[in-house]
Amino acid sequence: MINEIKTDAQTRMDKCVESTKTQMAKVRTGRAHPSLLDTIQVPYYGSLTPLKQVASVSIGDARTLNVSVFDRTMIAAVEKAIMSSDLGLNPMSAGATIRIPLPALTEERRKDLIKVVRAEAENGRIAVRNVRRDANSDVKALEKEKECTEDDVRRTEDEVQKFTDAHIKKIDEILAAKEKELMEF
C-alpha cells in the first residue's frame, strides 16, 4: 500500500512538471517555434479544430514560422484564427503557405513575460507540494488504521520529500532555461 502511494505521488509529480513545461512552451519568445501555435483553434466545418490538424507548422528562419494549410479553402480562416489569438502575430498569405514573422520583443514585454513564466513555475511548485501533502496524509491515514508503523510513515514521508525536492528542482531548471531564452536579444 505504501509503495502504491509513493508510485502515485511520483507519477502525479511528473505530470505537474510536464504541465508546467507545456504552459511555459506557450509563452512566446523572440525565437520561432512550432509549438507557439499549438493552442490556436480554427473553425473547420462548423467546429473548432486545432491548427495542427488542418495545417503543418514549420520554422522558416529564426523569426519566421511557415504554416502550410492542407485545404486551400481554409487559408483565410487560418489567417483569421492566428490574428485573433492573443499572441500578437500578423500572418501574411503567400499562395498555399502562410508566413508569420515574429516581431522582436521589447524590454518591457520581456519583463512581463518573465513575470508570467515565474507565475507558471510557482503554480507548478504548488501543484507538486499539493501532491506531497496528499501522499503524506494518505500514509498517516494508513498509520491510524494500524496498517503501517510510525517508522514506515517517517521513511515514506522522507522519500516523498525527496521526490518533491527533485521535481521542484526540475521546474526551477525549466524556469531558468525559459528566462535565459526570454532575455536573449
From Swiss-Prot:
It is found in: Cytoplasm. It holds the Pfam family RRF. SUPFAM superfamilies: Ribosome recycling factor, RRF (SSF55194). Gene3D superfamilies: 3.30.1360.40, Ribosome-recycling factor. Disulfide bonds: none annotated. The keyword Protein biosynthesis applies. InterPro entries: Ribosome_recyc_fac, Ribosome_recyc_fac_dom, RRF_sf. GO terms for cellular component: cytosol. GO terms for biological process: cytoplasmic translational termination. Coiled coil: none annotated. GO terms for molecular function: ribosomal large subunit binding. Keywords: Cytoplasm, Protein biosynthesis. Responsible for the release of ribosomes from messenger RNA at the termination of protein biosynthesis. May increase the efficiency of translation by recycling ribosomes from one round of translation to another. This is Ribosome-recycling factor. The gene is frr.
